[in-house]
Structures are given as structure tokens and as C-alpha cells.
Amino acid sequence: MIAEIISIGTELLHGDIVDTNSAYLAEKLTGCGIDVHYISTVGDNKQRLYKTLQQAVERADLIITTGGLGPTMDDLTREAISEITTCPLVMRPDLVIDIEGYFNHKRTTMTPNNLKQSYLPEGAIPINNPVGTAPGILLEKDNYIIISLPGVPREMKIMFEESVLPYIKKKNNLMIISKELHFIGIGESTLETKLEDIMDSMNPSLALLAGDGEVKLKITGKGRTKKKIENKISEIVKTVRNRVGEYIYGEDETSLPDEIGKLLSKRGVTIALAESCTGGLIGARITDIPGSSAYFKGGVIAYSNEVKINHLGVNKNTINKEGAVSPETAAEMASGVRQRLEADIGLSVTGIAGPEGGTDEKPVGLVYVGLAGIDGEVKTYKLNFKGDRNKNRWLTTQSAFYYLYRYLKFSFK
Amino acid sequence: MIAEIISIGTELLHGDIVDTNSAYLAEKLTGCGIDVHYISTVGDNKQRLYKTLQQAVERADLIITTGGLGPTMDDLTREAISEITTCPLVMRPDLVIDIEGYFNHKRTTMTPNNLKQSYLPEGAIPINNPVGTAPGILLEKDNYIIISLPGVPREMKIMFEESVLPYIKKKNNLMIISKELHFIGIGESTLETKLEDIMDSMNPSLALLAGDGEVKLKITGKGRTKKKIENKISEIVKTVRNRVGEYIYGEDETSLPDEIGKLLSKRGVTIALAESCTGGLIGARITDIPGSSAYFKGGVIAYSNEVKINHLGVNKNTINKEGAVSPETAAEMASGVRQRLEADIGLSVTGIAGPEGGTDEKPVGLVYVGLAGIDGEVKTYKLNFKGDRNKNRWLTTQSAFYYLYRYLKFSFK
């Protein structure tokens, strides 16, 4: 089955918003074994919308549109589909009731233009919209299927998951299964070299995705039976784990803070943070995880030297002699926060995020991470980043998590 | 001038990555007064890429492609342009030198396939790539211009800004100027009602963009002279400021932490944070701003009650009697951090982010913000959010910034 995705809305052609709907739909369709050949974006312009739809029904089996289903004059999707499919728009009394019900429930007044949304091309099946007024459209013709969803991502996604996905799965019985392996502490090119001989494998296929200071390997298999595809994927995973297993920190939907949370819970220990250049970002990422209060005590954002001295117990002489950005300060911060917040583990970072504050000796991007373990012993790590402020701060959190993860995973007695 | 944007790459059709390049280019082109009629995405497939390009040169004056310029066999953009324009590919000795130079500089070995990137369609001008090996292509034909840029956003953006934008501005002399007003403390629909009579204005046009707990108004004017457009925009801005000026916190590229930073600097005062449910996210956002060390002392991430008591001086009885999520605790947290970190202002948040931890009396989404002013007086604010954990945490930071901003702007003596 060949699919085409069409995003409708002038705001997309102005670049006011990024079209995330298409990537979402493309991923879901690919996951069902459907080949997406084209993604098109077109504005709220009658003529160009017709042309784009006409072309799509000629070259694809399944056309999914998003946007242009609202009640205003700009919303042209309904009319365009009616025209292209030669199915006249007819009012659906059941939809009138739904739309009136929606406004009653919200206790707001319905304006007459909302009734436009109760018209569908003849023969179309309305797709229920549990979170808005615009119903979707599903229309089967001899050679193609058109599905129209609203442009608001939240509405589109709920309707796709609840109604469209089950329908498509029935129509198309080729299955695609993917598995993701998450790596930390190894670069994309090194990984590619180590896996060179299997990277070209066709089924399952392998793809490396790098970004945000880590690398993912996506393994995708196609077939008719789940069992067979999963077996093929397992074989690849086994090969990869044999070669570079020590750099894999997780599979599928996960993140470093997620895996660290699991390890801390499993070992029944708590952690506290002392953050300088990250200003709270490590804490924000740790507490992103629901239930993190079980192992996260809290932290000190020690942005000024006073706070480092008064609230973490860093020695004034250490800062004067070695500087606030030094392994010695990082070590005292980690020890200090561990003791003062009565945690089992203390993690600290101090560095120069930029753009100001760098010197020849201590350039922008220099960062020290301190890790005080459960026995009180402290290790420090030196890092040199080359990014801008944002990137340096993010990579600092990634590195801190990396050392913490390895400590919890491998060095913990 | 009518433009079309084409994104090339199978990874886009799989939904592995979201196409942010097109929105970036669309915004820049719109800003130059160029109408973008279509955005298309096509995979690394010869036949479909040719068709898409052929169609584009027939209906647009300016075609910008991204992706498919790399050295591998999958990269087909160069060949496709050569075919469509009937300009044969010729090797450019100057580009060979550039590419060899790039590898020498990086001290890595050049593989022969990299030389593919030294071939350009005859008559094309290479676009310098300061951060990678793939040069871009600029080819002027009688009826259209094709510009090809790499798909890596960082490379694409630098090349667009440095080389393409100046070229396009010369070619097209209609000007578009935009101004953005940032609102906080007023909802999209209220704002729309208050501006109803001017929302339909054509030139300048007005658009409301809501998201992330705030609303933006984008005012866009078109014309031939800068002065005239700016005057028209100024009139609209004046009208808007007269009606809803108190909710405007900034113009154009800015953010709440940015404006708060400016106010703190201007007034020469410092701030400290006591964060519970946000776990460091407020600090992370404040320290996103370069130079924030001038006014940000630091903070305490008081995730556990122990930390609230021992490191912020919250009274144990307050927590036992009123609970950790209460106006009383928020007030003591704000006072405590202000005193202990010797800051002029203390800002605190405590709440239930979810998904667990809610009760009938104190449901998920209940948050208290505490603000201890320069005179030591404390105010607290109650909030009820209805989102998931992520959204509740983000909206908590937005609200805390809102109260802080209003304090600094209006109540400060």
C-alpha cells in the first residue's frame, strides 16, 4: 500500500509553525508496513489544494490529510474532497446532534458556521473527534482511500490512534516492528565502524540516529508474522550487544534519567545534586520522571561562590586557589551536597557554559563533574565542550548522567 | 515571486525526523515577501525526485531543496537537477581543492566518494559551506532559479543566511516586516475578543499564536519601503497597547526569563529560588540567559520535606499541619531561601505535578507560588492546572515567572 500525506494550512507555508503532524503520521504508517512516497504541504487556497489532492489520488492508495476541517471560510478540505471524489456534500443529522452536544457540554454558544462541520461527502464515514467539534472524514473509493483529520496535533493524534489506526491495520496486513537501542559514551562514527558489516542489512534494516549527546540504533523488520520478525530482530540485537553492549543503556522508549531512576530504586539509594553551570537543569531532568521523589532528595543550585561556600561547605581557599571551575571545587561540591542533604550519592557540576567567562587557561566549555559515591569516595571528570551555551549545558547534563549511570551499573559494590 | 520548498530524504518519509528545515525556509522566504505555494517531501528515489522537481520548475519561480547532497549513492539531488535543467555535471577543480582542504584541516582521510561533491551542473554557482563538505548549488535558468542546500539543519542555516538570503533579497524587492508582541496573564480567546475589530486587517495582518502557557500576536506588513511598513505596524501596536498593554511583557525575540533578567539587572537586585515540584526547571530557565550570574544567586531544590526543613528553614509543624503543598509552606520556602542565600528576592514553588500524589482535597495540578519581596514581605498564589506532569511543571514555571515579572514591573518601590 502506497500512502501520501497532505498538510493543509497557510500558516505552514509561512513557517509560523513546524509541521509535526506529517512526521507522526509517516512514522505510524511506516510502522504498519505502508510506504509513504510523498508528503505535501499546501495553503488554504482552493485551486492549489484541488491540484494537490487530484495528484495524490492518482498516485497513492491511501491519502491522509490534516487541517482545513474547521468552521471558517478558510477551511476548504471538505469541499475539495467532495469535488475530487464527485461525492456531493450532504448534511448529516447525527453530526448536527454531536456538534450541538459539544457546545452544550462546554456551556458556550454555537455559532451557525459550526454547522458547516456536519456536512460530509456522500458515502463518507465520519471519524469521531472526542476532543473537538470537527469530525474527520473517511471515504473509500474504488482505487483509493481518503482520510481527513483536523490539524490540531492533539485532536489529530487521538482520532488517528482511536479510529484510523485500527482501520488501516485491517486493510493492510504487512507488519513492521522496530526496536531502538540507546547508546551513551560512544560516537556515531565509531559505532558505525564497529557495525559496518551489518549496517547494510535489508530486513531487518539498521539506522543510526545521533543527536542530543547520544546515539540511537533503530532496527526495523518487515514480514507477515510477528514471531518471525521478532526473531530476526533479536539476532541483530544479540550481535550488537556482543560487540558494543557496554555502551547500551536502554531499549525503546527510555532516557538516561529514566534508567538512572530504575537503578537508584533497585539499589535503594538516594541522590542529591550540586549544580553550578547547569543551574537546575539536571534536577529538572531527574524530576521529569514520575516517582522520582523516591530517590531524589533535592539539590543546591550553587550559581554564586557564596552559595558554594555557605551551602555546600566548599572551602573558600579551594575556590581562591583552584577556582570555582576546578576538579577540587567539583569534588567538594559533590561531597558537600551528599553530606548536607543526607543522601547516599552526591553529584556535582561546575563549568563555563559561555558565551562569556572563558580564559585561555579555562575556556568556554570546560566542565568538571564530581561524583561522591555511597562510601563517600569522590571521583571527578574533566570535559571540554565546543558548543554554544545551550549545547554546553545540555551536554553537561548528559555527561553527568553518563558517569552516574556507569557508577550505578558497574562500580557499585 | 513564487517559491516551492522540497525536502529530500527517505528518513523524512519514515517519520524518523521532523522536517524543521522547511518551516525555517518558509519563514525566511515569507519574510522576504516571497509567496511559498507548496512544500513537498520526497525520498531518496530517483524517479519520484525527478517528478517532484519537474513539477516545481513548472509552477514556481524559485525552488529551494534541502538534502541529498552528500557523497553516498543515496544522494541524488545533484543528478536530478542536472537532468531537469539539462545542464551536464562537470567537475569543478576549485571545489576539489576545498573538499581536500576540509579533510586536511580535520586531519581525517578523504574517501574517493567525497569527490562526487565537486561535481556541479554546468553554469551553476557553488554555495560555500563553511561547516561541512557538501557545497550548495545555485542555478539560474530563464524561468526559474534552483537552490540546493544540505539537509543538516546547522549547515543549511549557515549557508542560507550567509549566501542565499543576500542573493534572494537582491532578486526580490517586495519587503515584509513582522513584529511580535508577547502576552502573559491573558488567554487567547479573551485577547481575540478585545482585538476583534482589527484582527481581520489585511496589511498589516494580525495572527494570534498560543502555546507553552503564553500568547503571541504577530503583526506582518508588506510594502516597498521600510518606513511605510513600520509606520503601519506602529499604529497597530499603539492600538493593541492601549487596549491590553498591561499583559504585554516583551516584543520580538524574547522570553519571560529574558525580561525578568533585564528588570533584575536594571533594579540591581538579586534572586534565589526554592523549587519543589519543578525540581530545578525554574533555575534551568533563568540560567538559560547568558549573564544571569549577575542577578541569580542560586537555589535549593527542596524535593523532600527534610530539605525543606533543614535547608530552607521551613517549620516542621507547618508541614505537619498544613502539608508540603500549602500557601504556608510556599511562604516559608520563599522567605527561607531569600534569607539563607542572602538574596533580595526569594521565589518558591510547591505543588503536585502528578501523575501520582493527588487527593480529593489536594488534586494533581495544585501548585502554590511564594514570592518574598525586597522588604521581606511574602505573597502566595494558588494555581490549579489540568495537564499532565510535563505540562503542569512547565505551567508552574510560567506562572512563577508571571508573578515575579509583575512584582518587578509594577509593585517594586
UniProtKB/Swiss-Prot annotation, chains A, B:
Pfam families, A to Z: CinA, CinA_KH, MoCF_biosynth
Domain of life: Bacteria
Alphabetized InterPro entries for the sequence: CinA, CinA-like_C, CinA_C, CinA_KH, Competence-induced_CinA, MoaB/Mog-like_dom_sf, MoaB/Mog_dom
Residue ranges of the TM segments: none
HAMAP family: CinA_B
Protein family per UniProt: Belongs to the CinA family.
Name the record gives this protein: Putative competence-damage inducible protein
Annotated organism of origin: Halothermothrix orenii (strain H 168 / OCM 544 / DSM 9562)
Lineage: Bacteria, Bacillati, Bacillota, Clostridia, Halanaerobiales
